[in-house]
Amino acid sequence: TKNVIVFLVIIMKLKSWMSKIDGKNEVLRLNIPGTHDCVTQFVQFSHISKCQNMNIYEQLYLGVRALDIRVESRGDRLKMVHGVAKAFNTKNHFSKQMDMADVLAHCYRFLDENPSETIVFQFKNDSAKEMERCFDLMLNNYINKNPEKWYTYNRSPYLDEARGKIIFIRRCKMDTTKGYDIGKTGIDFSNWVEQTTAVPKPLVLNTSGENEIKFIIQDRFKYKPEPRWNECIKPFLDSMNKWDGKYIINYLSTAGGLKGPYNNSKYINPKFLSYKLNKDYYYGTIYMDFPTKELTTKIIETNF
């Protein structure tokens, strides 16, 4: 029976895999494929900055349901970046820098075509300046243009609450003088601590507000690929078990060494692909560089 279920999951349409999930499940208690620095298909300094070879729509079609979004503010717009590197819609780097509206066009199109699905949208200012302004722009110039497309409460939603919507996770501070309702500004990840040191231990993140929830985050991105897998990723996977009340975020990506994300992923992704995941275990949201159909399917099928 188990083999039949696995086979059915493999052949089902990855674009609508959440249609098979009971809507009474919390979204963040599912095992979800995600993409790290998802907008970097076309990006400056590609050897060190390119983390994806597909656009947003193609990633979602492949089964990805969590997007790691990095932005900078330009006037009254939000532009896509990976650190100092600008992201574009095409190979032509003399074209206009990718705008948040371009990203959302992919998301809205996908959700319109697949209303059973939801997208976890982790939003971060990657420019280290105007942190609060980035949230102002995101809320007023983008989210409020299509509020029916967004889930912005500061709690983990049930799938039925979030189908056809984008779940907003705010990884930046906001201007507290603006009178925003903390309960309606997205799941609050503003206490996130960058894991910049070469220490393998994951970190705890507690959200703010009356519905405080705890996340365990593994994002030790300073390691070279081999120790990254052996000292950080694999031990974290080994520690997984059934749901115990803490939400999990696990990054397979790494910026360590000089080989760049693509070459690093050629070491880490096959390691993860050959790692045995248990059907009844909770692995959380797994962010990847250069995911394949095999990788997304591996994560998705643990939900069935």
Describe the residue ranges of each PLM region.
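A cross-family signal for N-terminal binding/gating loops and helix N-caps
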Residues: 71, 111, 127-130
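Surface-exposed substrate-engagement region within the catalytic domains
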Residues: 144-280
